[in-house]
Design a protein with these regions (language model features):
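Glycine-biased, small-residue-rich flexible motifs in mid-sequence functional cores and linkers
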Residues: 1-6, 85-291
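Short, small/acidic-rich helices and loops at N termini and domain boundaries
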Residues: 1-87
Length: 291
């Protein structure tokens, strides 16, 4: 893979100038293409992006770093990571349906085709052994039926879903809230390597980007977008990453199933937000029937 001029400019806007996906998308719409953004005056770009003085200074700095950023992209590629911009044909089509698709995604492994059925298995990272065992069973059962299991590599339910899929020889996709140099949690590094070989790791953050709570929550939109349905094995709190995934699924018209719903505040909120309660015994036919 070679580093294109368009990729370098988009990398400069996202990583150098720290512009978010909606802002960069608006600039692409207004100017037409990355080169036109770069050729425009700083004041014009800053006005269209509604940048503060500090943001404008970052933009000016980023514009002077194109050679260095090109070299950084080349090193990223040499490390085994594939950066794909939203302008690339190989960019995951499912992500294009988001209202705020990542401008660049970084991939290790191979993202399954959009035509391959995929289901997200998500839930609390506070899960007990029984909850994790249920997640493993869901992941394994989906993989045995040729379904890709998507999750977020977190402790608890996420890790269980990935583990089950891999144990069955299936494919799994992990969406990270950090760059690949900062796999989290650290104890899932081996699991991440296995996922890379039997599916894909994907993130919207460059390799050195650290994990933050907001990035963990924000990545849920990608987990949902890459899936045809969402199975929530455990929900711990009404204001959590899992609940954000439920809301994202509702907004993207993805069916959501809540395993073993009870009378807890979190379960009640999940159902109110559109999750369908189902029993603890995995019912794969129910989830896959209308996909």
């Amino acid at each position: 893979m070679t580093v294109t001029r368009d990729l370098t400019i988009l990398f400069a806007l996202t990583t150098g100038a720290h512009l978010g996906p909606k802002t960069v998308a608006a600039l692409l719409t207004h100017f037409g293409n990355p080169e036109a953004i770069w050729d425009a005056g700083v004041a014009d770009v800053a006005h269209q992006a509604r940048l503060t003085e500090e943001g404008t200074e970052r933009l000016v700095e980023a514009r002077g770093l194109t050679d260095a950023l090109t070299e950084e992209l080349e090193l990223i590629i040499e490390s085994g990571t594939t950066p794909l911009s939203i302008l690339d044909d190989n960019y995951p089509d499912r992500l294009r349906h988001l209202p705020d698709p990542p401008i660049i995604v970084y991939v290790r492994g191979e993202v399954p085709e959009e035509t391959q059925t995929a289901v997200a298995v998500v839930g609390t990272h506070h899960a007990d052994a029984d909850g994790i065992a249920e997640a493993v069973a869901w992941g394994k059962g989906f993989a045995q039926r040729g379904v890709v299991v998507v999750s977020g590599l977190a402790r608890g339910i996420d890790g269980g879903g990935h583990t089950g899929a891999l144990a069955a020889g299936g494919k799994s996709v992990a969406v990270l809230g950090s760059g690949f140099n900062n796999i989290y949690p650290p104890e899932h590094r081996v699991l991440a390597e296995q996922i890379e070989h039997q599916g894909a790791l994907i993130t919207e953050h460059p390799p050195r980007a650290p994990l933050t709570k907001s990035r963990l929550v924000y990545r849920n939109r990608m987990i949902v977008a890459l899936s045809d349905a969402v199975v929530v094995v455990r929900v711990h709190a009404p204001e959590s990453g899992t609940m954000e995934a439920v809301r994202q699924a509702r907004d993207l018209a993805r069916p959501v199933y809540l395993v073993g719903a009870d009378t807890s505040h979190a379960s009640v909120r999940a159902v109110a937000d559109g999750a369908m309660p189902i029993g603890r015994l995995p019912d794969f036919d129910l989830v896959l029937k209308y996909l």
